[in-house]
């Protein structure tokens, strides 16, 4: 019987493994490997990787562990001291000649700002056997350490062969002045243009070869004298590996050359303008490919043995991966065949077994479970079908038919005409003609050639058909019921039932169906109809739950074409009141048709009006809708003087007739209440928020639910109840669900620590892992949310601080808005979403706005291009009114023409800009002049118009607003009264200046208070002690703006006492006192409020009405003579007025805080006093100087390990929504619900059992 070695047994055998030598360790690994290599069990095969890791780890632990040096002196000084004996050549100790292997976890080097190399703090750097732990060091420091010692393998990695790097160094030396090398072995920067060009060429060659992955190819290109040896491997074929270098190089010389190469490369990165951060990947690839190991292990014989052993291990691991992939594919196909041939009952049962707790996700176990669940005949059926599929794959892989190249050209063509030509060549190879139900097969090879829907799609695209036409014709290939999609509105994509390719998106249903017919000119009216339909839903009563947003979408599709078909709608693209009124009439006519249809056809969903019976007469509904319309839209109706009630009633009747004639009886099908409610819950942001955090910390699986059991488990974890329990209360639909998922703070802290450990500075470009960074901010926000749920009062201060940092960070992000890309964490997908954010001003000539007469363009004429029956290109120009009548799907919108100057939009750049500027200036001057004399007459008084002409000055009424129809009259009148206009204008300006310079009257001296006031600092100290804050914070009320909060706590940087009665600090403190007194009076007189303020109502909601009336009697009056004293001190002694207000605030607080009776009032008044004063202080604190964005708000471990706190990594914390285009993204889009992809499988799985 085959022996099975488990991980537990290996770990147990490894407890004393440190006492073994290298030969004994290798013997143990060979023994275990020989036991496993003949096994086909996936679990045993996976242990091979563990064995190699174990071997590496043991050797690493056995390595020499030296003590750390005394690093009391600076690192730079320590390295300089080590450089004193410059003639010393590093000697590799005998102990280092032993075989050393890599640890299982690699440490990587990376770049910060192109100037510093850095390593994780855990990675030691070895100098003369001493291991130093550094965070960052400069390239110069890097070179010095390279000169006096060697880097440990944990830091810089390994090479495939010491000779490989030697070859590259030898080629590199040809680019360097040999005399310079001999004179100065320390190395000189390559600065000549010729040498830089030569070096760059070799550099790029090395970079390409490393990226190709073929080390043998690299060696052949860089060193042609290489000798190779063929290594025979058992069950692995052969592999070429370089062994010997024809040029004998001593280890010490090898180290010198490597050090010189690294020194040149590092220095060039620092000082040479030729090299940029784009060259850094070479160091990373050198590290990954292992070309730096020669620094620490120049003993070639031992090193080559290790390289050969490691190559063997890699080949074995590759075979393991291939075996694992093969078995995984086989398991998936078994499962698919089982579902198709036998049914889903057994497959669902196997899924439940495989997803049980404790089960290992092993493809081999899936195969065993599938075979076990089937009978003998069923097992043979599945096995035979899999072999047939596998054979089909092999045949397809070997297929070299000519149709493969044609299909590739067809799907990658850039122009429809080219694709149409390729399609004609493909059609010749069809095995059957006019096939629309299955794949078109190739008559040459018999394999699948092209799906029929692709054939039709290419034809439609070449004919420039509209999206609506393409969608309609391709719908016959869809596997989704069209009616179901229209009625329920829950399906957002269409897929081909033959090949499974996506056909269309629902998001394009309403917004792009008409592109090419009327463009996007009707977007405003479309949104208006959608919004008004949503408002109408407030008085409509539906018999069942209805998706009102989808209902509004249907209303837009019905009403919009009818509104555009009206003859007397203005030709201009004006969003005028008449157009709005017509839209409202058709919306209400559509609602009336739904009500009428539901009465005639009982299969339709019952629709009525709130407060009216379903069987009410049609006249009753008409009366209600007309009254509602005239009441709701009286503002629009009043703008139209010619509109009467009878006009509205007549047009309402005609609109109802049109809808009946065009659509017949219309009804809404009865929707499934369960799916509607569950859709609302699954789209709720709070559900998505809690579910995302639950996935992150492992409370629910990361993948979407695959079975009803998984879906119910996720739903219950997040909501706290099963769907069946929740739906039993759906009659109380208003927010019956709240998220019950509450991970405690310990769990969140543990979760964040895991992410902090993984959050290391990245190799590429020296940036953070932005996806994980965004996730941490997400967790921090959720932690604040939990604190709010548990203790709302104590939450306010932390939230205010969080918002302060958040706002400061938003300002910094705005300054960095020129950066091309931001990574934003998307909680729906769990990964970063890359979006372009470029903020640039586009400069346009003024002729794009105005013509040469200074008039604004009106682009109301649409130019369409088409092809007539004679195949001659034609153009047609129409207005908006004629678009529906004259334009069909064969026309495409080509350009716009101005109805004022008749220039095409693409020709505005050809207008004379100087003429435009001159005319615009004159037009503005005329507009100002005639607006000035619109009512007043230059001859005095007002105009006296008779027969449209002023009898005093001769002004015609029609030239006041129209300056182009009679230019001679306009200029004559302007020239006659230009001087008079200038005089009157200057006269008005002088009067205005005199008025503005009038000094205010002197304020009377306020009366002094009855009792003199003296300052008592003890009140402030006592108040600060109760609030547990510094007294300096209370003293700084009104004076925190622009100061650091740390300085405020210490009492530093306080401004001098006020010397003026208008000092803003006096107004700020006085406002704080008045707010405190106002809220306190609201509390005292709460019984007089019909609806008291929210913060007061929260305090007294448990009191009876009698107790609320008694508050006025039991609570003291704390106002006293505050206003009199403050007014007097503000004028006579502003500094004392500031202290008096602060002291009065503390006295009022202490008076309320120290109330002892009656007992039922004590807690109310004390909580009020604490809340009010804390709110005042926190509000003042928000005005303090925020400074740079402080990432400590998200936790200490969130900050990068290291001293660097520059702004270069700030884009890693980007969170859109505050500036620039992000504001546009947040505009309320009534069609936004269509962008959300709702998985119907999830809704089906959540159905109550």
From Swiss-Prot:
Induction: Expressed in the late phase of the viral replicative cycle. Transmembrane segments: none annotated. Its main location: virion. It is found in: Virion; Host cytoplasm. One of its GO terms (cellular component) is virion component. The keyword Transmembrane does not apply. Keywords: Host cytoplasm, Host-virus interaction, Inhibition of host innate immune response by virus, Inhibition of host IRF3 by virus, Inhibition of host RLR pathway by virus, Late protein, Viral immunoevasion, Virion. One of its GO terms (biological process) is symbiont-mediated suppression of host cytoplasmic pattern recognition receptor signaling pathway via inhibition of IRF3 activity. Signal peptide: none annotated. Interacts with the minor capsid protein p17 and with the hexon capsid protein p72 capsomers; these interactions form a rigid zipper structure that stabilizes the capsomers. Interacts with host IRF3. Together with the penton and the other minor capsid proteins (p17, p49), forms a complicated network immediately below the outer capsid shell, stabilizing the whole capsid. In addition, blocks IFN-beta transactivation mediated by the cGAS-STING pathway and regulates the transcriptional activity of IFN-beta. Mechanistically, suppresses the phosphorylation of host key adapter protein TBK1 and degrades host IRF3 in the cytoplasm. Belongs to the asfivirus M1249L family. This is Minor capsid protein M1249L.
């Amino acid at each position: 019987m085959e022996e099975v070695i488990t991980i537990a047994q290996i770990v147990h055998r490894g407890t004393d493994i440190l006492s073994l030598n290298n030969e004994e360790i290798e013997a143990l690994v060979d023994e275990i490997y020989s036991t496993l290599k003949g096994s086909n069990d996936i679990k045993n095969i996976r242990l091979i990787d563990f064995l190699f890791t174990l071997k590496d780890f043991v050797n690493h632990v056995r390595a020499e562990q030296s003590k750390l040096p005394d690093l009391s002196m600076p690192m730079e000084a320590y390295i300089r001291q080590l450089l004193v004996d410059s003639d010393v050549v590093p000697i590799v100790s005998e102990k280092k000649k032993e075989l050393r292997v890599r640890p299982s976890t690699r440490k990587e080097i990376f770049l910060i700002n192109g100037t510093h190399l850095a390593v994780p703090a855990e990675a030691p750097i070895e100098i003369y056997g001493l291991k130093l732990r550094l965070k960052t060091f400069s390239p110069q420091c890097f070179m010095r350490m390279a000169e006096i010692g060697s880097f440990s393998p944990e830091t810089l990695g390994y090479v495939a062969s010491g000779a490989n790097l030697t070859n590259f160094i030898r080629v590199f030396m040809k680019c360097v002045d040999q005399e310079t090398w001999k004179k100065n072995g320390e190395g000189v920067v390559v600065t000549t243009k010729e040498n830089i060009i030569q070096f760059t060429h070799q550099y790029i060659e090395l970079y390409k070869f490393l990226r190709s992955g073929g080390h043998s190819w690299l060696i052949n290109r860089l060193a042609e004298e290489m000798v190779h040896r063929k290594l025979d491997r058992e069950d692995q074929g052969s592999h070429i590996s370089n062994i010997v270098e024809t040029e004998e190089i001593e280890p010490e010389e090898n180290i010198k050359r490597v050090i010189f190469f690294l020194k040149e490369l590092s220095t060039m990165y620092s000082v040479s303008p030729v090299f940029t951060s784009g060259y850094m990947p070479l160091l990373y690839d050198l590290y990954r490919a292992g070309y730096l190991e020669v620094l620490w292990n120049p003993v070639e014989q031992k090193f080559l043995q290790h390289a050969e052993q490691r190559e063997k291990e890699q080949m074995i691991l590759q075979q393991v991966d291939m075996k694992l992939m093969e078995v995984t594919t086989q398991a998936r196909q078994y499962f698919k065949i089982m579902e198709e041939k036998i049914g889903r009952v057994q497959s669902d049962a196997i899924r439940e077994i495989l997803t049980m707790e404790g089960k290992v996700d092993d493809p081999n176990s899936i195969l065993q479970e599938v075979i076990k669940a089937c009978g003998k005949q069923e097992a043979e059926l599945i096995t035979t079908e899999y072999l047939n599929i596998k054979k089909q794959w092999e045949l397809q892989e070997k297929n070299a038919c000519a149709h493969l190249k044609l299909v590739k050209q067809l799907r990658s063509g850039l122009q429809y005409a080219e694709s149409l030509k390729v399609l004609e060549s493909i059609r010749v190879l069809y095995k059957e003609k006019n096939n629309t139900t299955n794949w078109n097969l190739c008559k040459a090879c018999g394999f699948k050639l092209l799906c029929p829907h692709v054939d039709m799609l290419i034809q439609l695209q070449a004919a420039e058909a509209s999206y609506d036409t393409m969608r309609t014709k391709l719908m016959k290939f869809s596997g989704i019921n069209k009616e179901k999609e229209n009625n329920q509105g829950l399906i957002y994509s269409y897929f081909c039932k033959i090949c499974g390719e996506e056909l269309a998106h629902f998001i394009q249903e309403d917004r792009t169906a008409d592109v090419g017919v009327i463009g996007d000119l009707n977007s405003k009216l479309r949104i208006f109809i959608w919004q008004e339909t949503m408002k109408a839903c407030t008085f409509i009563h539906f018999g069942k739950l209805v998706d009102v947003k989808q209902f509004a979408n249907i209303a837009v599709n019905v009403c919009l074409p009818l509104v555009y078909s009206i003859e007397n709608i203005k030709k201009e693209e004006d969003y005028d009141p008449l157009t709005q009124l017509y839209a409202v009439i058709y919306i209400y006519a559509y609602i009336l048709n739904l009500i009428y249809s539901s009465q005639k056809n009982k299969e339709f969903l019952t629709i009525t009006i709130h407060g009216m019976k379903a069987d009410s007469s049609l006249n009753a509904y008409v009366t209600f809708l007309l009254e509602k319309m005239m009441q709701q839209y009286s503002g629009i109706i009043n703008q139209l003087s010619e509109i009467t009630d009878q006009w509205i009633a007549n047009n309402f009747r005609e609109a109802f007739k049109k809808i009946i004639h065009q659509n017949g009886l219309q009804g809404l099908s009865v929707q499934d209440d369960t799916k509607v409610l569950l859709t609302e819950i699954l789209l709720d942001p709070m559900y998505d928020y809690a579910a995302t955090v639950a996935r992150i910390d492992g409370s629910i699986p990361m993948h979407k639910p695959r079975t009803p059991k998984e879906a119910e488990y996720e739903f219950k974890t997040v909501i706290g109840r099963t769907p069946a329990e929740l739906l039993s209360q759906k009659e109380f639909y208003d927010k019956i669900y709240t998220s019950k998922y509450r991970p405690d703070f310990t769990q969140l802290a543990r979760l964040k620590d895991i992410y902090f450990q993984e959050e290391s500075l990245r190799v590429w470009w020296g940036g953070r892992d932005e996806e994980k960074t965004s996730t941490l901010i997400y967790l921090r926000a959720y932690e604040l949310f939990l604190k709010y749920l548990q203790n709302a009062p104590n939450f306010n201060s932390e939230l205010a601080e969080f918002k302060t940092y958040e706002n400061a960070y938003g300002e910094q992000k705005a300054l960095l808005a020129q950066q091309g890309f931001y990574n934003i964490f998307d909680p729906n997908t769990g990964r970063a979403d890359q979006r372009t954010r470029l903020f640039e001003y586009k400069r346009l000539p003024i002729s794009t706005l105005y013509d040469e007469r200074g008039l604004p363009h009106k682009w109301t004429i649409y130019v369409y291009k088409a092809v007539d029956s004679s195949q001659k290109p034609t153009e047609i120009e129409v207005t908006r009114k004629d678009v529906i009548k004259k334009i069909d799907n064969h026309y495409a919108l080509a350009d716009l023409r101005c109805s004022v100057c008749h220039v095409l939009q693409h020709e505005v750049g050809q207008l004379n800009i100087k003429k435009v500027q001159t005319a615009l200036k004159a037009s503005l001057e005329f507009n100002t002049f005639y607006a000035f004399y619109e009512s007043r007459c230059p001859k005095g008084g007002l105009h006296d118009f008779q027969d449209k002409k002023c009898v005093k000055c001769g002004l015609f009424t029609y030239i006041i607003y129209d300056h182009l129809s009679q230019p001679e009259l306009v200029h004559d009148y302007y020239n006659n009264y230009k001087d008079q206009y200038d005089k009157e204008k200057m006269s008005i300006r002088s009067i205005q200046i005199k008025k503005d310079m009038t000094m205010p009257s002197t304020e009377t001296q306020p009366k002094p208070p009855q009792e003199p006031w003296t300052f008592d600092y003890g009140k402030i100290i006592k108040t600060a002690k109760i609030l547990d804050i510094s007294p300096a914070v209370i003293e700084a009320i009104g004076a925190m703006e622009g100061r650091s909060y740390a300085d405020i706590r210490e009492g530093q940087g306080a401004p001098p006492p006020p010397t003026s009665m208008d000092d803003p600090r006096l107004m700020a403190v006085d406002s704080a006192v008045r707010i405190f007194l106002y809220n306190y009076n609201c509390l005292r007189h709460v019984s007089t409020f019909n609806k008291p303020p929210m913060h007061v109502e929260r305090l007294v909601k448990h009191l009876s009405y009698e107790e609320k009336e008694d508050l006025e009697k039991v609570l003291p009056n704390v106002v006293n003579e505050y206003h009199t004293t403050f007014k007097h001190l503000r004028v006579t002694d502003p500094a004392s007025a500031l202290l008096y207000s602060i002291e009065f605030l503390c006295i009022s607080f202490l008076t309320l805080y120290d109330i002892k009776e009656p007992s039922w009032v004590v807690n109310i008044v004390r909580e009020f006093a604490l809340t009010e004063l804390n709110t005042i202080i926190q509000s003042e604190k928000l005005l303090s100087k925020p400074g740079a964005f402080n990432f400590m708000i998200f936790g200490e471990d969130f900050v990068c390990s290291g001293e660097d706190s520059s702004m270069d990594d700030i884009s890693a914390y980007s969170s859109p929504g505050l500036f620039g285009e992000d504001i546009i993204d947040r505009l309320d889009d009534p069609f936004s619900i269509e962008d959300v992809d709702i998985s119907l499988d999830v809704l089906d799985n959540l159905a109550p059992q």
